[in-house]
Amino acid sequence: MSRFIDRVVLHVSAGKGGNGCASVHREKFKPLGGPDGGNGGRGGDVVLEVDGNVHTLLDFHFHPHAKATNGKQGMGSNRDGAQGDDLILRVPDGTVVLDEDGRILADLIGVGTRFEAAQGGRGGLGNAALSSKARKAPGFALLGEDGVERELVLELKSVADVGLVGFPSAGKSSLVSVLSAAKPKIADYPFTTLVPNLGVVSSGDTTFTVADVPGLIPGASDGRGLGLDFLRHLERCAVLAHVVDCATLDPGRDPISDIDALEAELAAYKGALSGDAGLGDLADRPRIVILNKADVPEAAELAEMVTPDLEARGWPVFTISAVSREGLRPLTFALAKLVADYREAHPKAEPKRQVIRPVISNENSFSVVADPEIPGGFIVRGTRPERWVRQTQFDNDEAVGYLADRLARLGVETELVKQGAEPGASVTIGNVSFDWEPQTPAGVDLTRTGRGTDPRLDQVERIGATERKHASRIRRGLEGLDPEDQ
């Protein structure tokens, strides 16, 4: 029998982008073939997708690490590297995705709903894509970016219309088994139910789902018993039904005190989805009271005695027996009406396949702040500057010059001057620190060797066919040198 796991910590790693290729086209009779290095392939994404055939997070419990494939490196002849394959992770309907700080990133409801858990790194550009009028034959390419790597918390919260709450052995599982075709484990000892059981109930034209939550005890909201682990499964329920054991022989227990104790736990529990689900806190949900085990004579008398007090609270009260099936028909109609009223008040949006992606910030923005650890130093923060640094081959002078041009065009140099940076000041971008030297406007060469130039392009004097034929005959000794060449 498979274990029910409803909370896991998942470490996801997207694929790394492939490096670009620095290559020059070589072909017979084409001395100036030009750059032909292809771009690197994009790394694969890690995607969570709701699958109707998955009902637990068990797979992630045993395999908590998920990594997508990397993109391939670009090649010559303008051949781009292959993209990495996306890794699709199947999750149950009702999975909530949280970050390390407990913030909700996505609430996955509906088969086919997707969430991009980790984005693959961009592939680096090859030198063919980097060529321009000023840089006709770049001798460098850009490196691929690393994929996003993060830890996520996955929590499964059952998607049900009605949640059954009650003390252990109150008969919740028995009630689900007679209302629906579900076959939960039933026995005469406490905490028989260790996992939520879902059942589908049909009443007239209304079909709804019922969730049997493991038994609650006082202190469940503080972690006593099993309640803290399973109270989350009530967060999506539109209607809460108290299932009360009227035949209990435990001292100090009666239907009124049981309901009061459970109400205190529901009021104390603050679910993460209460506001997002649009249902309010658990204490605000519609209630219905089910007095169970009326087939026992003493239980039937007790149910009749406490019914007026419970009805005075404004809650519908039903006396039933899950064993003899007494009172099930009116109970089913009442539950169906409560669910139908809720659906009418909260119309469901048109079903569609949703894809949830992280919000992309403004990539052009950056900031320059003083370095608190290095006097006179500065730290540059921003999406683009940090990405450009990660893409740069610092052992290639042309690549470093290209990075300087990009930073100048973005306005980083201007901002450093405004902040009072002196020549030679330490500047940190990402994980790279360097001594800053002011440059002239972007595109003007300050290095000894030109950035991205091909010396063959400076050969303006061409040798004609006659001269090449004469030189060939001289090499073979068929002719002598001209007097002016001697």
From Swiss-Prot:
Region of interest (Disordered), ranges: 462-486
Entry's localization field: Cytoplasm
Matching Pfam families: DUF1967 (PF09269), GTP1_OBG (PF01018), MMR_HSR1 (PF01926)
Keywords from the named record: Cytoplasm, GTP-binding, Hydrolase, Magnesium, Metal-binding, Nucleotide-binding
Domain of life: Bacteria
Cofactor(s) needed for function: Mg(2+)
Binding residues for GTP: 166-173, 191-195, 212-215, 292-295, 321-323
OCT domain segment(s): 358-438
Keyword Nucleotide-binding listed: yes
Principal cellular location given in the protein's record: cytoplasm
Protein's GO biological process: ribosome biogenesis
Protein name stated in the entry: GTPase Obg
UniProt organism field: Rhodococcus jostii (strain RHA1)
